[in-house]
Design a protein with these regions (language model features):
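Acidic-and-aromatic substrate-binding clefts and catalytic sites of carbohydrate-active enzymes
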Residues: 43-46, 67-79, 105-107, 121-123, ...
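Conserved, mostly hydrophobic/aromatic
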Residues: 66, 144, 218, 283-285, ...
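Noncatalytic carbohydrate-binding groove/subsite architecture in carbohydrate-active enzymes
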Residues: 120-122, 151-283, 289, 293
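Substrate-binding cleft of extracellular glycoside hydrolase catalytic domains
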Residues: 78-185, 283
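Boundary/entry segment of secreted carbohydrate-active catalytic domains
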Residues: 8-54
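Aromatic-rich peripheral "rim/lid" segments of glycoside hydrolase catalytic domains that contact
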Residues: 10-21, 26-27, 294-315, 319-406
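Catalytic domains of carbohydrate-active enzymes, especially glycoside hydrolases
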Residues: 50-75
Length: 406
């Protein structure tokens, strides 16, 4: 099921020549969100050798651009070291980073009331470290993202108003002008489609307009999977599909989910153009979990399973590649620290490969074709979930209950 866009008659540009402008929208350089945590706590950091295993797997899938989220921990430094080591081992190895700097409001993650129009003192440290790393590894880091879903108002524990993101974007753009940061590094913020003006008018403020003008491109997020619960206008079976075989019902539902994501993308483009701006818009994050015991599972919207997840992946890759849009798919590997107290929570199950080194359905064909031959994760070869039994997989695929008008 995995769509791999192998370069055809195209010489891969060497790292020093490669820029964000050349990377983004280039189907020879597929993108993904990456976290290498194996344990249920980020206190246990992935080692350089573990990260190198991950990088070899991703490279085999023709994924060459990774998105990270913060510089709090050793993970990003170890990731940069791992890439550097692999480049020394193989001069043709390529991997680039969209480096995230985490942004919080004042009092975020404390017992105090969050103050959304003031910022955490930690933000300055994040930005300073992002600059240091970018200057140290300019051949790897090609993009800096200021904040992750840092402006969306449902992030009640930490979101900031757009002026705070704008402050740091302008700071980084000024460093480029002062030759204190590589001029070809692109600066953005990676946020929900609503935060970029694609939804309600309460987001349409002048600071957002100035931010859109200040970034080098827009990195927007779209999650139809979450909206199968929160805004399920697209989710369900149409009246004229009720007699379809179950697989066709699911396929039709997933096509509508993909189209819902496209509509959110287009809503951001539309708002951007409405304020007189025309610059690239790429997908900084989208994904579809394979398990959930919450809103999205069998007791909820019946959205999460390996078949639907694989289909969403393929549909999004097909559309984004066709339109030269980079899609940083969420995510490469399952990480169970995200909802450590609830092992079946959806946040733990967005990866293409699980923590048992098993390729989910989306990658079964890659197992068959030998993509992972000789590669291991945590010492284990990459095998298939469900022992490759598609009938067993389909026992976990449920059809949405909702009936939609034709």
């Amino acid at each position: 099921m995995f769509i791999s866009c192998k370069p055809t008659n195209t010489r891969n540009l060497v790292s020093k020549e490669m820029t964000a402008e050349k990377l983004l929208g280039n189907t020879n350089y597929q993108a993904i969100c990456y976290g290498g945590y194996r344990a249920n706590s980020r206190e246990i950091q992935p080692t350089i050798s573990e990260i190198k295993e991950d990088l070899r797997i991703l490279s085999a899938l023709n994924i060459k651009v990774l998105r990270t989220y913060n510089v709090h921990y050793e993970e990003v430094v170890n990731l940069l070291k791992a890439i550097t080591e692999l480049k020394k081992e193989d001069e043709n190895f390529e991997m680039y980073l969209m480096l995230g700097a985490w942004i919080d409001c004042k009092n975020a993650w404390t017992n105090l009331q969050p103050i959304h129009n003031e910022e955490s003192k930690r933000n300055a440290i994040e930005i300073e470290e992002a600059v240091r790393l970018t200057n140290k590894y300019p051949e790897i880091i090609k993009i800096i993202a200021v904040g992750n879903e840092a402006m969306v108002k449902w992030a009640t524990s930490y979101y900031v108003t757009p002026n705070i993101i704008l402050k740091w974007v302008n700071h980084l753009q000024n460093l480029k002008k002062e030759n204190k940061l590589p001029k070809q590094v692109w600066i953005t913020s990676s946020d929900n489609f609503a935060s970029w003006g694609g939804h309600t008018a309460d987001y349409h403020v002048e600071d957002l307009n100035q931010l859109i003008k200040a970034v080098d491109y827009i990195s927007m997020h779209t999650y139809p999977m979450h909206d199968t619960h929160y805004h399920p206008i697209f989710w369900g079976i149409k009246e004229n599909e009720l007699q379809f075989p179950e697989k066709e019902k699911v396929d039709a539902a997933m096509l509508r989910a993909r189209n819902y994501a496209i509509n959110q993308y287009e809503s951001v483009v539309s708002y951007m153009k409405s304020i007189g701006v025309n610059k690239p818009v790429h997908i900084g994050e989208t994904g579809w979990a394979t398990k959930s015991n919450e809103h999205y599972g069998n007791d909820g919207s019946k959205a999460t399973d390996e078949y639907k997840s694989a289909l969403y992946y393929d549909l999004m890759r097909e559309w984004s590649n066709k339109n030269n849009i980079s899609c940083f798919y969420f995510e490469a590997f399952d990480e169970n620290w995200k909802d450590a107290a609830n092992p079946l929570g959806s946040e733990n199950h967005f990866g293409l490969i699980n923590l048992q080194s098993q390729a989910k359905y989306v990658l079964w064909k890659n197992v068959d074709s030998g993509t992972f031959k000789g590669l291991t994760r945590d010492g284990k070869p990459i095998t298939k979930t469900y022992n490759g039994d598609e009938k067993a997989l389909w026992l976990d695929v449920k059809t949405p209950n909702s009936i939609l008008k034709n």
